[in-house]
């Protein structure tokens, strides 16, 4: 359905009119730099461009008091000295004669985006706005924010569109206390915020930014705070937070809409955040969110003050919303001790309210020794202090050379053994008819008796041709079919062909009667995960087997708690998903697995289906590999005790080697 980009050039008008070192970083170039980069990359042209409208005062009143709206309206006629005096009554705020107009446009852009997504005009989108909004409170401007754009959008989605479950993900580096205050007693809005906290020593210096602030009244458990107590958090820390905290709760909540307070001051190079996450990380975060709410994701710009980092991160977010695969992540995939402490503390605080966490080890852990915030306003961290120096020395090369992988000419191809006239594919998914050379196909088939039959040989030839197209960069992802009797042999050939023709690290996720070939080299180049094995077993660091969970909750726990952490730790450049005889997966479960694995290997995922599964699975897998959202799994269910036991056993065996499995700090060396 497409991606919307909502913007209005008038939002560059508001600016600081006096000297204020605290506020000078919020400047018009934040918008123009991001928009210019989108145009340079050809991304704006691929979006449905919407010109932002002003929010009405009635719409602003969904979250703000009439008196506050009136106060901001009156700034249009104030002089410089009066504006400065009024600004001084708030924390980290400046007003300009155009602020009221710009802030109404910013709020209106979020409303337009929500309307476009919820009416089906587009699938998702980004609103490029300023001033930002997530610190804005019912009767107060705060932290560069005038009207709370995302909160207004959430209230509008409830009132106008009748939504009952809205997820707000705030990945800005500052705590969006404005959103928290507005919805802390509302169970229809699940608010997640990670933020630089430093045990209360970082702005906005609030006790209620800590992990144990979980909402109140009926909203208990619907506020999720993840406080970062050190600077320098990187890609592994952010992905671990999603896998071990946000996504388990989000799947249980089952949102109808995802709103993102998309602040990019949490990216590398930003002077406010001093974090290490590269722009590509936001592509992965976006893609992980797109498996929720039928892909209805609305991102609204918040912070971001390093123009290069901001522009790159915006581009990564938009190209992922457009359905492009996420580029590979850089750096070691091992969360740091401080991140694990914060994640586990948040899990422990949330466990009483969420079934998905109650079956796991979520005991609270003591924080690393530090000076916790005293009563009153604590002293800020000094920029030259030892805690800040690591982030200040962030490698600029990560921004100087952004990951610009050329897109394959074909996003998704399907190679079936026989044409299926009932198969409905997206218009840009091609049905491949070509095959590898007969002599080459026979050579690969020769060691396998099950590949001697003509039907199996034909299927193998089509698979080899498709796989070569993926390895050569002509095709991004694909689906191939094979006779059930030849499924194991065909998978064996696919693995060996991939490793011998360019893949350096191959991840194979095999379901059903598909055992790892005993003579496959144990050289660390392949990671084999067998789901539907006879028992949970870590046969080696690179060979893991687990039974297929019987409940949807167990399946989600397996994907989020085992498969994806292993996959992100391994960082493959080719993923094979094989559904063999007796695989036991229903269409929505297979689609979710493929959609979430698509975040790996630059989206280079090949799904191998045994023929009996092809009619019901080929279409749905083609859609998710092509960038569409998977269907909902329906109402959440808990994992069975047997599934929980298998998962905990495997995590215990594998955590020392695979750091992304960890969500408890005592395991860090």
Swiss-Prot record:
Renumbered residue ranges of the record's region Histone deacetylase: 1-323
Segments of skewed composition (Polar residues): 361-373
Annotated stretches, region: Disordered: 361-387
Gene3D superfamilies named among the record's database cross-references: Histone deacetylase domain
Keyword Kinase: no
Annotated residues for binding of Zn(2+): 172, 174, 265
GO biological process: chromatin organization; DNA repair; epigenetic regulation of gene expression; homologous recombination; macroautophagy; negative regulation of DNA-templated transcription; negative regulation of transcription by RNA polymerase II; polyamine deacetylation
Main location: cytoplasm
Binding site for substrate: 20, 305
Subunit and partners: Interacts with HDAC3. Interacts with HDAC2 and NCOR2/SMRT. Interacts with HSPA8/HSC70. Interacts with MSH2.
Disease as annotated in the protein's UniProt record: In neuroblastoma cells, may promote autophagy in response to chemotherapy-induced DNA damage and efflux of chemotherapeutics via lysosomal exocytosis, hence protecting cells from cytotoxic agents. Expression levels may correlate with survival in neuroblastoma patients, with low levels in the tumor correlating with long-term patient survival and high expression with poor prognosis. Therefore has been proposed as a biomarker to predict neuroblastoma chemoresistance and treatment outcome.
Function statement: Polyamine deacetylase (PDAC), which acts preferentially on N(8)-acetylspermidine, and also on acetylcadaverine and acetylputrescine. Exhibits attenuated catalytic activity toward N(1),N(8)-diacetylspermidine and very low activity, if any, toward N(1)-acetylspermidine. Histone deacetylase activity has been observed in vitro. Has also been shown to be involved in MSH2 deacetylation. The physiological relevance of protein/histone deacetylase activity is unclear and could be very weak.
Protein name, entry field: Polyamine deacetylase HDAC10
Name of encoding gene: HDAC10
């Amino acid at each position: 359905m497409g991606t919307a980009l909502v913007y209005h050039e008038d939002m560059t008008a508001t600016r600081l009119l006096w000297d204020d070192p605290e506020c000078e970083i919020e400047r018009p170039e934040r918008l123009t730099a991001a928009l210019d980069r989108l145009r340079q990359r050809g991304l704006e042209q691929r979006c449905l461009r919407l010109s932002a409208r002003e929010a009405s005062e009635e719409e602003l009143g969904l979250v703000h008091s009439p008196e506050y709206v009136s106060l901001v309206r009156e700034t249009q006629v104030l002089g410089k000295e009066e504006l400065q005096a009024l600004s001084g009554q708030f924390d980290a705020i400046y007003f300009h004669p155009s602020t009221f107009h710009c802030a109404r446009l910013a709020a209106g852009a979020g409303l337009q985006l929500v309307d476009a997504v919820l009416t089906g005009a587009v699938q998702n989108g980004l609103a490029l706005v300023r001033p930002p909004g997530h610190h804005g409170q019912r009767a107060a401007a705060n932290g560069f924010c005038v009207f709370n754009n995302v909160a207004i959008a959430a209230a509008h989605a409830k009132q106008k569109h009748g939504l009952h479950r809205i997820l707000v993900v705030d990945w800005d580096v500052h705590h969006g206390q404005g959103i928290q205050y507005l919805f802390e007693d509302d169970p229809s809005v699940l608010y997640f915020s990670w933020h630089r906290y430093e045990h209360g020593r970082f702005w906005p210096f609030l006790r209620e930014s800590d992990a144990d602030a979980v909402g109140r009244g009926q909203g208990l458990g619907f506020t999720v705070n993840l406080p970062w107590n050190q600077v320098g958090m990187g890609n592994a820390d952010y992905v671990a937070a999603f896998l071990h905290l946000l996504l388990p709760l989000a799947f249980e909540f089952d949102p109808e809409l995802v709103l993102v307070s998309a602040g990019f001051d949490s990216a590398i190079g930003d002077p406010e955040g001093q974090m290490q996450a590269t722009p590509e990380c936001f592509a992965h975060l976006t893609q992980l969110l797109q498996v929720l709410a039928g892909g209805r994701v609305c991102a609204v710009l918040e912070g971001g003050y390093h123009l290069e980092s901001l522009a790159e991160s915006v581009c990564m977010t938009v190209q992922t919303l457009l359905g492009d695969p996420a580029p590979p992540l850089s750096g070691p995939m091992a969360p740091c001790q401080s991140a694990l402490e914060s994640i586990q503390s948040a899990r422990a605080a949330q466990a009483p309210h969420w079934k998905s966490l109650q079956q796991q080890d979520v005991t609270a852990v003591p924080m690393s020794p530090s000076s916790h915030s005293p009563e009153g306003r604590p002293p800020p961290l000094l920029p030259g202090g030892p805690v800040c120096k690591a982030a200040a020395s962030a490698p600029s090369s990560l921004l100087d050379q952004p990951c610009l992988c050329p897109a394959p000419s074909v996003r998704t191809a399907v190679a079936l053994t026989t044409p299926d006239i009932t198969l409905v594919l997206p218009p840009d998914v091609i049905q491949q008819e070509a095959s590898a050379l007969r002599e080459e196909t026979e050579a690969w088939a020769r060691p396998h008796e099950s590949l001697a039959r003509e039907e199996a040989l034909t299927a193998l030839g089509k698979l080899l041709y498709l796989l070569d197209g993926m390895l050569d960069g002509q095709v991004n992802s694909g689906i191939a079919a094979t006779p059930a009797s030849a499924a194991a042999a065909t998978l064996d050939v696919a693995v060996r062909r991939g490793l011998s023709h360019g893949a350096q690290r191959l991840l194979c996720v095999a379901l059903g009667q598909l055992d790892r070939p005993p003579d496959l080299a144990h050289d660390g180049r392949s990671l084999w995960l067998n789901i539907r094995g006879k028992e949970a077993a870590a046969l080696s660091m690179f060979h893991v087997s687990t039974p297929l969970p019987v409940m949807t909750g167990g399946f989600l726990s397996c994907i989020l708690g085992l498969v994806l952490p292993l996959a992100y730790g391994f960082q493959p450049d080719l993923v094979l998903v094989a559904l063999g005889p007796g695989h036991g997966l229903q269409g929505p479960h297979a689609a979710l697995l493929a959609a979430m694995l698509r975040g790996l290997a630059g989206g280079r995922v090949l799904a191998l289906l045994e023929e009996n599964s092809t009619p019901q699975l080929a279409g749905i897998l083609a859609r998710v590999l092509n960038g569409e959202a998977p269907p909902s799994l329906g109402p959440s269910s808990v994992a069975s005790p047997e599934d929980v036991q298998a998962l905990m056993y495997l995590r215990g065996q594998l955590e020392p080697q695979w750091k992304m499995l960890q969500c408890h700090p005592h395991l860090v060396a």
